[in-house]
Amino acid sequence: MAIWEQLEVSKAHVAYACVGVFSSIFSLVSLYVKEKLYIGESTVAGIFGLIVGPVCLNWFNPLKWGNSDSITLEITRIVLCLQIFAVAVELPRKYMLKHWVSVTMLLLPVMTAGWLIIGLFVWILIPGLNFSASLLISACITATDPILAQSVVSGKFAQRVPGHLRNLLSAESGCNDGMAFPFLFLSMNLILHPGNGREIVKDWICVTILYECLFGCLLGCFIGYVGRITIRFAEKKNIIDRESFLAFYVVLAFMCAGFGSILGVDDLLVSFAAGATFAWDGWFSQKTQESNVSTVIDLLLNYAYFIYFGAIIPWSQFNNGEIGTNVWRLIILSIVVIFLRRIPAVMILRPLIPDIKSWREALFVGHFGPIGVGAIFAAILARGELESTFSDEPTPLNVVPSKEESKHWQLIACIWPITCFFIVTSIIVHGSSVAIITLGRHLNTITLTKTFTTHTTNGDNGKSSWMQRLPSLDKAGRSFSLHRMDTQMTLSGDEGEAEEGGGRKGLAGGEDEEGLNNDQIGSVATSGIPARPAGGMPRRRKLSRKEKRLNRRQKLRNKGREIFSSRSKNEMYDDDELNDLGRERLQKEKEARAATFALSTAVNTQRNEEIGMGGDEEEDEYTPEKEYSDNYNNTPSFESSERSSSLRGRTYVPRNRYDGEETESEIESEDEMENESERSMASSEERRIRKMKEEEMKPGTAYLDGNRMIIENKQGEILNQVDIEDRNEARDDEVSVDSTAHSSLTTTMTNLSSSSGGRLKRILTPTSLGKIHSLVDKGKDKNKNSKYHAFKIDNLLIIENEDGDVIKRYKINPHKSDDDKSKNRPRNDSVVSRALTAVGLKSKANSGVPPPVDEEKAIEGPSRKGPGMLKKRTLTPAPPRGVQDSLDLEDEPSSEEDLGDSYNMDDSEDYDDNAYESETEFERQRRLNALGEMTAPADQDDEELPPLPVEAQTGNDGPGTAEGKKKQKSAAVKSALSKTLGLNK
């Protein structure tokens, strides 16, 4: 068949086209495949490589490119070095120092146990192999793969995995690829030197352990340290651009692969040590946390590599009885690998691994040990070492060596297909485990939702009783406001100031969350109602001598600053058309004025100290020198903070600006400026480290594992653990939805406040979905059909999406409406309450403890009327209550015993008879005088009217009737009380 001569088809060109077509198509649907189907790119790329490979279409066949062993080994080396370096860089700051115990337990005992167990089963199931050869095959699959582990480390499913487990799996997958070398070469020495124990031990300890592993770690630490120092120096001097800065770690990964291969050390361990040292202080991760250049490079390499692997899988050798790779043997071995390689060892060693908190976490860590690229690298490396004993030319992967060439021909022939079968099994099992777990949770959620809806829906408008206990957001009768709660701020030395200024710093300005700066995001927002002290008027605090002196000095400083700034501003803008020379002259004049200003302060330093030690009489004296001294000591900003900091401690000598010679004072001032800049850089580094430590102490996520709640920061470090004790066990279906989360939180560490011990309510289907949509960010989720779940903990309202992600946190602050102010509040011991009870305006039955108010009725407001609603009266408004209307978190009980009994979920308010002051003797006399029970001497200037005689009282019902007397007495009391309370003005 003739082909048009213009078409130049080659193997490399076809490979480029296949990789490009797959990458473009998969990129278009990558979000759906990863976030909805929970399938990683490695699985899909392997399937595509199988389709276009020699098994199906035969478009892409790397086995015909020539030396396939060497090509596969070098491609695998580069991919592994990049991935391992990236894993080490993305670990939290100083992670290996803080968690070396957990990582060591997973590397040494867990890997050793898996190596021995799998080697034993390979020896049993594969005929013709001795135990040493079986250990070599087992050593190839001992390490876990950092690429396949990304399915549980990053992505949507990773948000459901605790952060400390994600970090542990990442660190382990990066380390154990390099730590597989001791197991690999120990097995190799057992095969090559049988019966020669001295040679085996000497070669394994001196060459493998000390040189390849230990020296490789030191080499990696050196490369990482030098890279960190040089990139910080380049960034400090501003001689590196942004693109090179982001791609610098890729360069270091290539450097590790190159020098590690040249020196013959464990280049995978070199890459991990270099990455951990390079990102040891967290500076590089902080600088590159918003950019994803490294992720893009890794993604492209993963696409290409797994397409390549899918094309070279030896499917024809998976059922080759000549070398012992029957398919049923391989299936049994795969089941053994999945269940016995890691799970038993991790479950047994769980008490010795600090980062594994429960048996469920131990099972999860034991299961997610995927086999991938590291196994390919180890298998080809072991095959090449065995072939080097009898030939300099490596045997291709798809060729079975003859029995005459080497006595290890079966091991050379079967090590590659057995390893590839384990990799395919791991991709299928571990790649689909995430989807299966998520599907199981989804089905479980659907079943629970149907059960709750069927058994608990009743009442008006199809609402359930457990839903009615929440403050409904679609009612207008109850006035309350929702404010974002503080989930990011760390209380430091300005804690009291932040609390007092919460109303000013809150999100009350109507700004969107994206438009706020870092200081405003996460600040505490209050209801805007200032706390009213007892008596109605806050007491003015007397200032001490020191505070008066500081206030007086502050006024003088402000005055001097205004004079200086106005003078410089007027001089600056006298001429609108200044050339470059004029601008430079103005700048020098301003610097000269600043120098003179600072010079005058140095002359009067001693006098300032005498003035500061004097009394209030000495402080009343005001001189210009004192003003300058105060301004100097407090370092005012003239034009910029840099200039003001450079003026501190400098001595200036006035001279002509046209002189060409420099004085000694100017040279000294330049040296001091350099020292000042160095000190400022050191202080900025200290501030950065302090800020990073504060970020590490901020709680980010809480995970519930049985009766234990684990609180982590954003980096996955565990901050606290809380034990949850269930109090109510047996309830009916309806009550269980509302009250199964009745629990008390017992603090096992020290960083958790008692406010976290509230009881939990969950809404599965909110009543007003439109209102909930208005509470969440519109930019995050514009789909109005999505579900939201709300949790109420005391007066906190937490809104989550259907994936369990927290969208918003709000604080419910009840407000006093006009109707509420006009209503009678139950006051048992107050004068007004007793007076109204005595005249019959208030029934004695209502004078006691008020009946429980249905919260649903209270929410609906005055539109609903019933016997439980309070009457609306405008005659005698109640004085300000002694208790605060808006509920604060600080009012919660601090001990767990009080926490369990202090809050009742069925009550909307707590009424306390002792919350009001007892009646004084003077108030009692006034009350009795107003009621006519007691006669007191009265003057003409008294504001109260004397009680009317009974015989003078008249009414519509006649003077002698009981009803008339009652109304007349009521009118007199109303008049007296109105005058007393200041209503008749």
UniProtKB/Swiss-Prot annotation:
Biased composition (Basic and acidic residues): 559-572, 580-593, 676-698, 815-828, 854-863
Modified residues (Phosphothreonine): 765
Compositionally biased tracts (Acidic residues): 661-675, 887-920
PANTHER family per UniProt: NA(+)/H(+) ANTIPORTER, NA(+)_H(+) ANTIPORTER
Gene Ontology CC: endoplasmic reticulum; membrane raft; plasma membrane
Protein name as annotated: Na(+)/H(+) antiporter
Source species: Saccharomyces cerevisiae (strain ATCC 204508 / S288c)
Record keywords, A-Z: Antiport, Cell membrane, Ion transport, Membrane, Phosphoprotein, Sodium, Sodium transport, Transmembrane, Transmembrane helix, Transport
Gene Ontology MF annotations: potassium ion transmembrane transporter activity; sodium:proton antiporter activity
Cytoplasmic side: 1-12, 58-70, 127-128, 198-203, 266-294, 341-361, 432-985
A Pfam family matched in the record: Nha1_C
Positions of the UniProt region annotated as Disordered: 489-701, 726-760, 812-985
